[in-house]
Amino acid sequence: MTDVLPTTPTASGVTDRPLSEVDPEIAAVLDAELGRQRDTLEMIASENFAPRSVLEAQGSVLTNKYAEGYPGKRYYGGCEHVDVAEELARTRAKELFGAEHANVQPHSGASANAAAMHAFIRGGDGILGLELAHGGHLTHGMKINFSGRMYDVSSYGVDPQTFRVDMDVVRAVALESRPKLIIAGWSAYPRQLDFAAFRSIADEVGAHLMVDMAHFAGLVAAGLHPSPVPHAHVVTSTVHKTLAGPRSGLILTRQEFAKKIDSAVFPGQQGGPLMHVVAAKAVAFKVAGSEEFAERQRRTLEGAKIVAERLTAPDVAEAGVSVLTGGTDVHLVLVDLRDSKLDGQQAEDRLHEVGITVNRNAVPFDPRPPMVTSGLRIGTPALATRGFGAAEFTEVADVIALALKPEFDADALRARVAKLTAEFPLYPSAGSFA
């Protein structure tokens, strides 16, 4: 029989009852998910573990507050405390990335991209971005996405031999299509982009340059990846992934474009900001300015290079497995399975069987459908956050390599994964979040 909630608002009513009492089904979901995260190795490149401090801010009483507008210019009363939170988030973001202006209200990276486009171009204008099948993002011009429906899309791809972006090709496409906005950024590309070259091309064709640094923002914050801020007219990002903050968005720009960006976010794209998430962003930006965070990013890069090196070894190559571009400059490795007996779905399932979570991913010129694919995207941020160093990444890289070979011992590999999860407990003092 379903529990009946109290009908009168008393001190002992629903506002004071824990989740485990009010909704045991959802409490069970939280406990089960915490168990999954603790007992497996998370290697999806876009995922990370937010610090407990971020989780506390996001699950706070700021959830209750509406705050349409911006600090000091709200359309609601009672915003004096959330104004402080948003100012801290804006100031910390600007300092972290060396930007003149920051908007911390976007609900997601996609929202940030939509607002940035809305600020600089109009419906029907041309945009130029990395082709989705070659590592671009949905919001960079996919036909069924808002970006593909609203704008005239041209795309650049990667070289069929090197699988790298060729700036001469980008320039040629830009000169032919004359876009109003050029997008540099990616969702699945293992190398750094030349932001100065992108800006030069944008200037040549009279376009604005937008850089989507959602995946590598944490590396930029730590000084381990070139910053797009000096080159781009506008920079967008998520605050999770390598930044390990709440799932949300961020826009950085110059002071001359501040009003345009702010108006595009509110009221152009959104209503009230999620102030509990804004506060969590402020915490994440503070953490990202620490030496501990920089050290974690160094281990993230080191881990990705270790994984890439192991997956280029002769025994793995014999199984038809290769690494796109031969390595990585960032936090992820793209695995090409076109010559393997495994497709992307099968490889993902195999790693899941031994306790490693990755995602299947299309590779450039992929002959298989998107729900199957011929590749894997493997990332190291979450394991670096968990505390992994060179020795642990060497071990997990070997587990991955053995799991992708035709014959593998699932029980033995699962035991090796279990040993790693036990040695590096996740949220050890949390008990249950439910």
Swiss-Prot record:
Uppermost EC category: transferase
The UniProt record lists the keyword Amino-acid biosynthesis: yes
Cysteines joined through disulfide linkages: none
Any single GO BP term: tetrahydrofolate interconversion
GO cellular component term, pick one: cytosol
Required cofactor(s): pyridoxal 5'-phosphate
Subunit structure comment from the entry: Homodimer.
UniProt protein name: Serine hydroxymethyltransferase
Organism annotation: Kineococcus radiotolerans (strain ATCC BAA-149 / DSM 14245 / SRS30216)
Annotated gene: glyA
